[in-house]
Protein backbone atom coordinates (compact mmCIF):
# COMPACT_ATOMS: atom_id res chain seq x y z
CA UNK A 1 0.00 0.00 0.00
CA UNK A 2 2.80 2.43 0.91
CA UNK A 3 4.53 1.88 -2.45
CA UNK A 4 1.26 2.34 -4.31
CA UNK A 5 0.60 5.63 -2.52
CA UNK A 6 4.13 6.81 -3.22
CA UNK A 7 3.73 6.10 -6.94
CA UNK A 8 0.31 7.77 -6.98
CA UNK A 9 1.79 10.89 -5.39
CA UNK A 10 3.71 11.59 -8.61
CA UNK A 11 0.52 11.63 -10.68
CA UNK A 12 -0.96 14.98 -11.65
CA UNK A 13 -3.84 16.09 -9.46
CA UNK A 14 -3.28 13.45 -6.75
CA UNK A 15 -2.92 14.58 -3.12
CA UNK A 16 -1.86 12.03 -0.48
CA UNK A 17 -2.61 13.47 3.01
CA UNK A 18 -0.20 11.17 4.86
CA UNK A 19 2.74 12.68 2.94
CA UNK A 20 2.00 16.17 4.28
CA UNK A 21 2.27 17.40 7.85
CA UNK A 22 0.71 20.67 9.04
CA UNK A 23 2.74 22.87 11.40
CA UNK A 24 0.56 24.91 13.76
CA UNK A 25 1.07 28.28 15.43
CA UNK A 26 0.49 28.64 19.18
CA UNK A 27 -3.00 30.01 18.47
CA UNK A 28 -3.95 26.82 16.61
CA UNK A 29 -3.83 28.32 13.12
CA UNK A 30 -1.79 26.61 10.42
CA UNK A 31 1.68 28.07 9.86
CA UNK A 32 2.73 25.87 6.93
CA UNK A 33 2.86 22.30 5.61
CA UNK A 34 5.91 20.08 5.50
CA UNK A 35 5.38 17.73 2.58
CA UNK A 36 6.99 15.02 0.50
CA UNK A 37 4.81 16.28 -2.38
CA UNK A 38 5.16 19.62 -4.14
CA UNK A 39 2.35 21.74 -2.73
CA UNK A 40 -0.06 23.07 -3.76
CA UNK A 41 -1.45 20.19 -5.79
CA UNK A 42 -2.99 21.55 -8.99
CA UNK A 43 -6.48 20.32 -9.81
CA UNK A 44 -6.75 18.40 -13.07
CA UNK A 45 -9.48 19.53 -15.48
CA UNK A 46 -11.40 17.44 -18.01
CA UNK A 47 -11.20 19.58 -21.14
CA UNK A 48 -12.91 17.02 -23.37
CA UNK A 49 -16.27 17.57 -21.70
CA UNK A 50 -18.02 19.14 -24.71
CA UNK A 51 -17.78 16.18 -27.09
CA UNK A 52 -18.15 13.35 -24.55
CA UNK A 53 -21.50 13.67 -22.77
CA UNK A 54 -21.88 12.03 -19.36
CA UNK A 55 -25.21 10.37 -18.62
CA UNK A 56 -26.59 7.43 -16.65
CA UNK A 57 -26.40 4.31 -18.88
CA UNK A 58 -29.04 2.42 -16.88
CA UNK A 59 -32.59 3.51 -16.15
CA UNK A 60 -34.94 1.82 -13.71
CA UNK A 61 -38.52 2.26 -12.48
CA UNK A 62 -37.17 1.67 -8.95
CA UNK A 63 -34.69 4.57 -8.95
CA UNK A 64 -35.36 7.91 -7.24
CA UNK A 65 -35.75 9.52 -10.68
CA UNK A 66 -37.93 6.78 -12.09
CA UNK A 67 -37.27 5.78 -15.72
CA UNK A 68 -35.19 8.86 -16.39
CA UNK A 69 -31.79 9.27 -18.04
CA UNK A 70 -29.76 11.77 -16.01
CA UNK A 71 -27.57 13.93 -18.25
CA UNK A 72 -24.81 16.22 -16.97
CA UNK A 73 -25.48 19.30 -19.08
CA UNK A 74 -22.54 21.29 -17.81
CA UNK A 75 -19.84 21.38 -15.19
CA UNK A 76 -19.18 24.47 -13.16
CA UNK A 77 -21.26 27.59 -13.67
CA UNK A 78 -21.01 30.70 -15.83
CA UNK A 79 -22.28 32.82 -12.94
CA UNK A 80 -20.21 33.83 -9.92
CA UNK A 81 -22.46 33.68 -6.87
CA UNK A 82 -20.09 34.50 -4.03
CA UNK A 83 -21.35 31.82 -1.64
CA UNK A 84 -21.33 28.95 -4.14
CA UNK A 85 -18.67 26.22 -3.92
CA UNK A 86 -19.75 24.51 -7.15
CA UNK A 87 -19.43 27.67 -9.22
CA UNK A 88 -15.86 28.26 -8.03
CA UNK A 89 -14.45 24.78 -7.47
CA UNK A 90 -15.50 23.47 -10.89
CA UNK A 91 -14.16 26.39 -12.90
CA UNK A 92 -13.66 26.77 -15.78
CA UNK A 93 -17.27 26.42 -16.85
CA UNK A 94 -17.66 23.66 -19.43
CA UNK A 95 -20.84 22.68 -21.23
CA UNK A 96 -21.97 19.49 -22.93
CA UNK A 97 -22.99 19.65 -26.57
CA UNK A 98 -26.65 18.92 -25.79
CA UNK A 99 -27.47 18.17 -29.43
CA UNK A 100 -24.88 15.36 -29.51
CA UNK A 101 -25.90 14.09 -26.06
CA UNK A 102 -29.64 13.96 -26.74
CA UNK A 103 -29.13 12.24 -30.12
CA UNK A 104 -26.86 9.65 -28.46
CA UNK A 105 -29.43 8.99 -25.73
CA UNK A 106 -32.15 8.70 -28.39
CA UNK A 107 -30.19 5.90 -30.11
CA UNK A 108 -29.65 3.97 -26.87
CA UNK A 109 -33.15 4.14 -25.41
CA UNK A 110 -36.15 3.26 -27.56
CA UNK A 111 -38.93 3.79 -25.01
CA UNK A 112 -39.67 5.92 -21.93
CA UNK A 113 -37.41 8.61 -23.31
CA UNK A 114 -37.19 11.02 -20.40
CA UNK A 115 -34.07 13.09 -19.76
CA UNK A 116 -33.26 14.86 -16.51
CA UNK A 117 -30.87 17.70 -17.24
CA UNK A 118 -28.41 18.25 -14.37
CA UNK A 119 -26.73 21.63 -14.44
CA UNK A 120 -26.55 24.63 -12.10
CA UNK A 121 -27.68 27.05 -14.81
CA UNK A 122 -28.74 26.95 -18.44
CA UNK A 123 -26.30 28.33 -20.98
CA UNK A 124 -27.90 31.10 -23.02
CA UNK A 125 -25.72 30.18 -26.02
CA UNK A 126 -27.45 26.79 -26.41
CA UNK A 127 -29.64 26.58 -29.53
CA UNK A 128 -32.87 25.57 -27.80
CA UNK A 129 -34.86 26.11 -30.98
CA UNK A 130 -33.03 23.24 -32.72
CA UNK A 131 -33.13 21.01 -29.62
CA UNK A 132 -36.84 21.66 -29.13
CA UNK A 133 -37.62 20.39 -32.65
CA UNK A 134 -35.52 17.23 -32.16
CA UNK A 135 -37.26 16.49 -28.85
CA UNK A 136 -40.63 16.92 -30.51
CA UNK A 137 -39.82 14.70 -33.52
CA UNK A 138 -38.47 11.87 -31.33
CA UNK A 139 -41.02 12.17 -28.51
CA UNK A 140 -38.38 12.87 -25.88
CA UNK A 141 -39.36 14.56 -22.63
CA UNK A 142 -36.80 16.70 -20.82
CA UNK A 143 -36.88 18.25 -17.35
CA UNK A 144 -34.56 20.76 -15.67
CA UNK A 145 -32.99 20.42 -12.22
CA UNK A 146 -33.26 24.18 -11.68
CA UNK A 147 -33.71 27.40 -13.63
CA UNK A 148 -32.44 30.94 -13.44
CA UNK A 149 -35.03 33.63 -14.01
CA UNK A 150 -33.15 35.19 -16.90
CA UNK A 151 -33.00 31.86 -18.76
CA UNK A 152 -36.71 31.34 -19.28
CA UNK A 153 -37.31 32.09 -22.96
CA UNK A 154 -40.25 30.91 -25.09
CA UNK A 155 -38.44 27.74 -26.25
CA UNK A 156 -37.74 26.58 -22.70
CA UNK A 157 -41.30 27.42 -21.66
CA UNK A 158 -42.59 25.23 -24.48
CA UNK A 159 -40.20 22.38 -23.56
CA UNK A 160 -41.30 22.61 -19.92
CA UNK A 161 -44.96 22.53 -20.86
CA UNK A 162 -44.60 19.48 -23.11
CA UNK A 163 -42.40 17.60 -20.66
CA UNK A 164 -45.17 17.73 -18.05
CA UNK A 165 -42.54 18.56 -15.42
CA UNK A 166 -44.47 18.83 -12.16
CA UNK A 167 -41.91 20.64 -9.99
CA UNK A 168 -40.02 23.74 -11.01
CA UNK A 169 -37.10 24.93 -8.88
CA UNK A 170 -35.54 28.38 -8.54
CA UNK A 171 -33.21 29.84 -5.91
CA UNK A 172 -33.96 33.44 -4.91
CA UNK A 173 -31.71 32.79 -1.83
CA UNK A 174 -33.21 35.84 -0.09
CA UNK A 175 -36.18 38.18 -0.39
CA UNK A 176 -33.94 41.25 -0.34
CA UNK A 177 -32.64 42.87 -3.54
CA UNK A 178 -29.80 44.43 -1.53
CA UNK A 179 -28.67 41.12 -0.06
CA UNK A 180 -29.02 39.34 -3.40
CA UNK A 181 -26.68 41.92 -4.94
CA UNK A 182 -24.25 41.24 -2.08
CA UNK A 183 -24.30 37.56 -3.10
CA UNK A 184 -23.77 38.54 -6.76
CA UNK A 185 -27.15 37.13 -7.79
CA UNK A 186 -28.06 39.77 -10.29
CA UNK A 187 -31.83 39.65 -10.42
CA UNK A 188 -34.48 41.48 -8.44
CA UNK A 189 -37.79 40.69 -6.77
CA UNK A 190 -39.43 42.31 -9.79
CA UNK A 191 -37.69 39.73 -12.02
CA UNK A 192 -38.91 36.93 -9.74
CA UNK A 193 -42.51 38.13 -9.98
CA UNK A 194 -42.25 38.39 -13.78
CA UNK A 195 -40.95 34.79 -13.79
CA UNK A 196 -43.94 33.66 -11.70
CA UNK A 197 -46.34 35.25 -14.17
CA UNK A 198 -44.56 33.43 -17.02
CA UNK A 199 -44.98 30.00 -15.43
CA UNK A 200 -48.49 30.66 -14.13
CA UNK A 201 -50.19 28.77 -16.95
CA UNK A 202 -47.75 25.86 -17.17
CA UNK A 203 -48.78 22.39 -16.03
CA UNK A 204 -46.51 22.42 -12.95
CA UNK A 205 -48.06 21.44 -9.63
CA UNK A 206 -45.23 22.62 -7.35
CA UNK A 207 -42.87 25.60 -7.31
CA UNK A 208 -39.81 24.99 -5.13
CA UNK A 209 -37.93 28.01 -3.77
CA UNK A 210 -34.51 27.87 -2.07
CA UNK A 211 -33.70 30.44 0.61
CA UNK A 212 -30.76 30.95 2.97
CA UNK A 213 -30.56 32.87 6.22
CA UNK A 214 -27.69 33.89 8.46
CA UNK A 215 -25.98 35.62 5.52
CA UNK A 216 -23.28 38.27 6.06
CA UNK A 217 -24.75 41.79 6.58
CA UNK A 218 -28.22 40.27 7.07
CA UNK A 219 -30.68 42.14 9.30
CA UNK A 220 -34.25 41.45 10.41
CA UNK A 221 -35.70 43.33 7.42
CA UNK A 222 -33.94 40.82 5.16
CA UNK A 223 -35.57 37.98 7.10
CA UNK A 224 -39.00 39.61 6.80
CA UNK A 225 -38.45 40.10 3.06
CA UNK A 226 -38.36 36.29 2.59
CA UNK A 227 -41.90 36.02 3.96
CA UNK A 228 -43.11 39.05 1.97
CA UNK A 229 -41.78 37.62 -1.28
CA UNK A 230 -43.47 34.26 -0.63
CA UNK A 231 -46.75 36.05 0.06
CA UNK A 232 -46.51 37.95 -3.22
CA UNK A 233 -45.77 34.76 -5.16
CA UNK A 234 -48.68 33.04 -3.41
CA UNK A 235 -51.05 35.82 -4.53
CA UNK A 236 -50.20 35.07 -8.18
CA UNK A 237 -49.63 31.32 -8.23
CA UNK A 238 -52.32 28.97 -6.96
CA UNK A 239 -50.24 25.80 -7.10
CA UNK A 240 -48.29 24.21 -4.22
CA UNK A 241 -45.23 26.19 -3.09
CA UNK A 242 -42.37 24.38 -1.31
CA UNK A 243 -39.81 26.41 0.61
CA UNK A 244 -36.36 25.00 1.35
CA UNK A 245 -34.74 27.01 4.16
CA UNK A 246 -31.03 26.54 4.82
CA UNK A 247 -28.49 28.07 7.18
CA UNK A 248 -25.69 29.96 5.44
CA UNK A 249 -22.49 27.90 5.67
CA UNK A 250 -19.27 29.59 4.46
CA UNK A 251 -17.49 27.32 1.99
CA UNK A 252 -13.80 26.90 1.08
CA UNK A 253 -12.55 28.30 -2.25
CA UNK A 254 -15.26 31.00 -2.30
CA UNK A 255 -15.16 34.76 -1.57
CA UNK A 256 -17.03 34.04 1.67
CA UNK A 257 -14.46 31.56 3.01
CA UNK A 258 -13.33 34.29 5.46
CA UNK A 259 -16.81 34.81 6.95
CA UNK A 260 -18.00 33.71 10.36
CA UNK A 261 -21.15 31.65 10.77
CA UNK A 262 -24.04 32.76 12.98
CA UNK A 263 -24.58 31.04 16.33
CA UNK A 264 -27.31 28.48 16.98
CA UNK A 265 -29.45 31.00 18.90
CA UNK A 266 -29.63 33.27 15.86
CA UNK A 267 -30.74 30.45 13.55
CA UNK A 268 -33.31 29.15 16.05
CA UNK A 269 -34.90 32.57 16.50
CA UNK A 270 -35.02 33.45 12.79
CA UNK A 271 -36.16 29.98 11.73
CA UNK A 272 -39.03 30.12 14.21
CA UNK A 273 -40.12 33.54 12.92
CA UNK A 274 -40.14 32.31 9.30
CA UNK A 275 -41.94 29.08 10.27
CA UNK A 276 -44.61 30.98 12.19
CA UNK A 277 -45.24 33.45 9.35
CA UNK A 278 -45.28 30.84 6.59
CA UNK A 279 -47.75 28.73 8.57
CA UNK A 280 -50.25 31.56 7.98
CA UNK A 281 -49.91 31.30 4.17
CA UNK A 282 -52.17 28.77 2.49
CA UNK A 283 -50.69 25.80 0.59
CA UNK A 284 -47.04 26.60 1.38
CA UNK A 285 -44.81 23.82 2.70
CA UNK A 286 -41.65 24.64 4.67
CA UNK A 287 -38.68 22.26 4.65
CA UNK A 288 -36.16 23.34 7.29
CA UNK A 289 -32.58 22.19 7.29
CA UNK A 290 -31.43 20.92 10.69
CA UNK A 291 -29.58 23.68 12.55
CA UNK A 292 -27.41 21.13 14.41
CA UNK A 293 -26.48 19.43 11.15
CA UNK A 294 -25.68 22.81 9.57
CA UNK A 295 -23.38 23.70 12.48
CA UNK A 296 -21.59 20.35 12.12
CA UNK A 297 -21.32 20.85 8.36
CA UNK A 298 -19.89 24.32 8.96
CA UNK A 299 -17.20 22.91 11.28
CA UNK A 300 -16.22 20.14 8.88
CA UNK A 301 -16.36 22.21 5.66
CA UNK A 302 -13.63 24.60 6.88
CA UNK A 303 -11.95 22.30 9.36
CA UNK A 304 -8.65 20.44 9.23
CA UNK A 305 -7.38 16.96 10.07
CA UNK A 306 -7.63 17.61 13.82
CA UNK A 307 -11.38 17.10 13.42
CA UNK A 308 -10.88 13.38 12.76
CA UNK A 309 -11.76 12.85 16.43
CA UNK A 310 -15.39 13.79 15.61
CA UNK A 311 -15.81 10.56 13.66
CA UNK A 312 -14.78 8.60 16.75
CA UNK A 313 -17.36 10.27 18.99
CA UNK A 314 -20.32 7.94 19.17
CA UNK A 315 -22.86 10.53 20.35
CA UNK A 316 -26.28 11.76 19.20
CA UNK A 317 -26.05 14.87 17.01
CA UNK A 318 -27.42 17.38 19.56
CA UNK A 319 -25.08 16.21 22.32
CA UNK A 320 -22.16 16.13 19.90
CA UNK A 321 -22.74 19.76 18.82
CA UNK A 322 -23.11 20.83 22.45
CA UNK A 323 -19.70 19.33 23.28
CA UNK A 324 -17.84 20.92 20.36
CA UNK A 325 -17.48 24.33 22.05
CA UNK A 326 -13.82 24.94 21.16
CA UNK A 327 -14.29 23.66 17.62
CA UNK A 328 -17.28 25.95 17.02
CA UNK A 329 -15.45 29.00 18.33
CA UNK A 330 -12.31 28.26 16.31
CA UNK A 331 -13.70 26.97 13.02
CA UNK A 332 -16.99 28.79 12.46
CA UNK A 333 -17.77 31.56 14.96
CA UNK A 334 -14.79 33.76 14.10
CA UNK A 335 -14.06 35.82 11.01
CA UNK A 336 -10.85 34.62 9.36
CA UNK A 337 -7.87 36.92 8.85
CA UNK A 338 -7.02 38.00 5.32
CA UNK A 339 -3.61 36.28 5.23
CA UNK A 340 -4.64 33.21 7.23
CA UNK A 341 -3.34 29.92 5.83
CA UNK A 342 -6.34 27.65 5.22
CA UNK A 343 -6.22 23.83 5.27
CA UNK A 344 -7.45 23.79 1.65
CA UNK A 345 -4.77 26.20 0.38
CA UNK A 346 -2.65 23.16 -0.46
CA UNK A 347 -5.07 22.44 -3.33
CA UNK A 348 -4.79 24.77 -6.33
CA UNK A 349 -8.18 24.91 -8.06
CA UNK A 350 -7.02 27.53 -10.55
CA UNK A 351 -8.45 30.57 -8.75
CA UNK A 352 -6.15 33.11 -7.15
CA UNK A 353 -6.83 33.65 -3.43
CA UNK A 354 -6.37 37.39 -3.96
CA UNK A 355 -9.21 37.31 -6.51
CA UNK A 356 -11.50 35.71 -3.92
CA UNK A 357 -10.58 38.34 -1.32
CA UNK A 358 -11.22 41.14 -3.82
CA UNK A 359 -14.64 39.65 -4.61
CA UNK A 360 -15.42 39.67 -0.89
CA UNK A 361 -14.32 43.30 -0.64
CA UNK A 362 -16.40 44.16 -3.68
CA UNK A 363 -19.47 42.64 -2.00
CA UNK A 364 -19.00 44.82 1.09
CA UNK A 365 -18.23 47.95 -0.93
CA UNK A 366 -21.38 47.55 -3.04
CA UNK A 367 -23.78 46.61 -0.26
CA UNK A 368 -25.14 50.13 0.14
CA UNK A 369 -25.90 50.54 -3.57
List each language-model region with its residue ranges:
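Acidic, low-complexity intrinsically disordered segments
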Residues: 1-86, 91-95, 99, 319-338, ...
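Radical SAM enzyme core and accessory elements
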Residues: 277-369
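Structured core elements
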Residues: 15, 51-54, 60-63, 68-76, ...
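Glycine-rich beta-alpha loop elements in corrinoid/cobalamin-binding modules
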Residues: 1-34, 255-304, 312-314
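Glycine- and acidic
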Residues: 66-70, 82-91, 112-118, 175-182, ...
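Short glycine/threonine-rich loop-to-helix capping motif typified by GTGT followed
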Residues: 125-132, 157, 217-225, 253-264, ...
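A glycine-rich phosphate-binding loop feature that marks nucleotide/adenosyl-phosphate handling sites
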Residues: 6-18, 120-125, 147-151, 214, ...
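Conserved SAM/AdoMet-binding glycine-rich loop
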Residues: 102-242
Amino acid sequence: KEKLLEKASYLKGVYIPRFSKPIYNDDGKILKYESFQNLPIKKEINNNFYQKPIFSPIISPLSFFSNMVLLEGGRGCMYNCRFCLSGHFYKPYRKTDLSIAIKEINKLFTSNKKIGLILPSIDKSISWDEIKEFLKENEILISFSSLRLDQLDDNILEILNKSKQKTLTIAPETGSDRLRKFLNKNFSNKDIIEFVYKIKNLSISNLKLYFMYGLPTEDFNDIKSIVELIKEIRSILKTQISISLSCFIPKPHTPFQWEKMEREEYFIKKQEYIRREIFKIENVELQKESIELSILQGIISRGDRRLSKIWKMNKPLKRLIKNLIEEKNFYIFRERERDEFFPWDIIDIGINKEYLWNEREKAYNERGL
